[in-house]
């Protein structure tokens, strides 16, 4: 999608309140990707993305900005937590697994696009597979009359299948099953091994299963995709997308910074993780199930609150790989009020739509919304600042009884006013000990 930086920021304004600096920097970074692709191949290789370090408390919009953009522009995107990785030689996930995760995200993205483009062919394949089970093909040498009868029966069955009349009927189908897909107890560090065995086909077997036709339609989608779609071209396109459009969002990077005030260096593996991360961010080759993925042009966005450490506590080499830094603003009551009212799918709209399913019309008057924002802001000031996430807790507590008794208000309109907000939340916010547990 070819959008100018101004258009990108305008799009983000519908979902993320404030944070103009962060939006601007990311918009420029994404536009530079488009600009790079217009250049000669030789020059493209020399232009590397300027990675971004976002500094700000939880809940201020760091992840949301990156996630929304990646989804809107159709870029492969993954969010990982730096604190979940371990240094090479320690038990746990190695940093290369984030690149394999990005490869999987790119592969799924391209597969879904191709399935959508070839939807009619895939639906026809699934339809024919199910019809073969419902009405097995006639043997050779059957009379023309019998063949005509069979053809008519097949078309009647096809019509019923398309109309959903047979959805509850049960059939036995044969589907591929991989032992790694069905074993949830495998450790995360087995990710590379899983990719390898899937590529060479080891551990995969055909199993027969009885299921309803509506479930069989979904179960056969993968097989249909494997048969109809060009798997090699899908992998090739996924590799290209991951390398040139991939975004890896590294959250909690402050958790692997070794604080200068910590003379004991309680966790020596933190620096080890940083050093393992360095070649990935600088540019290296990682083996994935879609091929050797070069990380040179992946955009890395790191984020952290940096309450107990500073960006300068990261090793100098890693600091240098994140040249663009932006500090996100904390959210005051005015920003929280806007978060409740401005976004397309604001929190209040979500709750209203949920209760609408119970035939209950829910409204919030303006004074009530302002009071909710004030209470959330005060809770953030007096306790840990969790940004906009505090609104979820506050509104859940406010609407707890109404959600429980929603059926009693069916067919009615319920207006949340300032008085109700004060009655439900006033005593809690005044009692700091109680507020710590509830809000």
Curated annotation (Swiss-Prot):
Pfam family, one: ClpB_D2-small
Stated family: Belongs to the ClpX chaperone family. HslU subfamily.
Organism: Campylobacter jejuni subsp. jejuni serotype O:2 (strain ATCC 700819 / NCTC 11168)
Lineage top rank: taxon: Bacteria
Name by which UniProt lists this protein: ATP-dependent protease ATPase subunit HslU
Keyword ATP-binding among UniProt keywords: yes
UniProt subunit comment: A double ring-shaped homohexamer of HslV is capped on each side by a ring-shaped HslU homohexamer. The assembly of the HslU/HslV complex is dependent on binding of ATP.
Binding positions for ATP per the UniProt entry: 17, 59-64, 251, 317, 389
PANTHER family hit by this protein: ATP-DEPENDENT CLP PROTEASE ATP-BINDING SUBUNIT CLPX-LIKE, MITOCHONDRIAL-RELATED, ATP-DEPENDENT PROTEASE ATPASE SUBUNIT HSLU
Gene: hslU
């Amino acid at each position: 999608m070819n959008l100018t930086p101004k258009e990108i920021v305008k799009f983000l304004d519908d979902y993320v309140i404030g944070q103009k600096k962060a939006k601007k920097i990311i918009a420029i970074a994404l536009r530079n990707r488009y600009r790079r692709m217009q250049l000669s191949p030789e020059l493209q290789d020399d232009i590397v993305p300027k990675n971004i370090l976002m500094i700000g408390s939880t809940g201020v919009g760091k992840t949301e900005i990156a996630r929304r953009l990646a989804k809107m522009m159709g870029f492969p995107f993954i969010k990982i937590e730096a604190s979940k990785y371990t240094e090479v030689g320690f038990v746990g996930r190695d940093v290369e697994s984030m690149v394999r995760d990005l490869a999987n995200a790119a592969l799924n993205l391209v597969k879904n696009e191709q399935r959508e483009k070839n939807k009619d062919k895939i639906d026809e394949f699934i339809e024919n597979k199910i019809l073969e089970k419902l009405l097995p093909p006639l043997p050779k040498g059957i009379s023309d009359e019998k063949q005509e009868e069979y053809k008519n029966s097949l078309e009647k069955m096809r019509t019923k299948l398309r109309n959903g009349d047979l959805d509850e009927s049960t059939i036995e189908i044969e589907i591929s099953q991989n032992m790694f897909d069905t074993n949830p107890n495998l450790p995360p560090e087995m990710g590379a091994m899983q990719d390898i065995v899937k590529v060479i086909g080891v551990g995969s077997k055909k199993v027969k299963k009885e299921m309803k036709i509506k479930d069989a339609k979904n179960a056969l989608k993968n097989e249909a995709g494997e048969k109809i779609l060009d798997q090699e071209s899908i992998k090739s396109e996924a590799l290209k997308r991951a390398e040139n459009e991939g975004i890896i969002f590294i959250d909690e990077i402050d958790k692997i910074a070794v604080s200068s005030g910590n003379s004991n260096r309680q966790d020596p593996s933190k620096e080890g993780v940083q050093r393992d991360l360095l070649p990935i961010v600088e540019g290296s080759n990682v083996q994935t199930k879609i091929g050797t993925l070069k990380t040179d042009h992946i955009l890395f966005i790191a984020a952290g609150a940096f309450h107990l450490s500073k960006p300068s506590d990261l090793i100098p080499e890693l600091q240098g790989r994140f040249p663009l830094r932006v500090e996100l603003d904390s959210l005051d009551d005015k920003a929280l009020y806007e978060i409740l009212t401005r976004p397309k799918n604001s929190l209040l709209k979500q709750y209203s739509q949920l209760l609408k399913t119970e035939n209950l019309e829910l409204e919030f008057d303006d004074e009530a919304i302002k009071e909710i924002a004030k209470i959330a802001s005060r809770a953030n000031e007096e306790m840990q600042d969790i940004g906009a996430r505090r609104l979820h807790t506050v509104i859940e507590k406010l609407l707890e009884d109404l959600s429980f008794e929603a059926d009693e208000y069916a067919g009615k309109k319920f207006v949340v006013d300032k008085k109700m907000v004060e009655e439900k939340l006033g005593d809690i916010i005044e009692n700091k000990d109680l507020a710590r547990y509830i809000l």
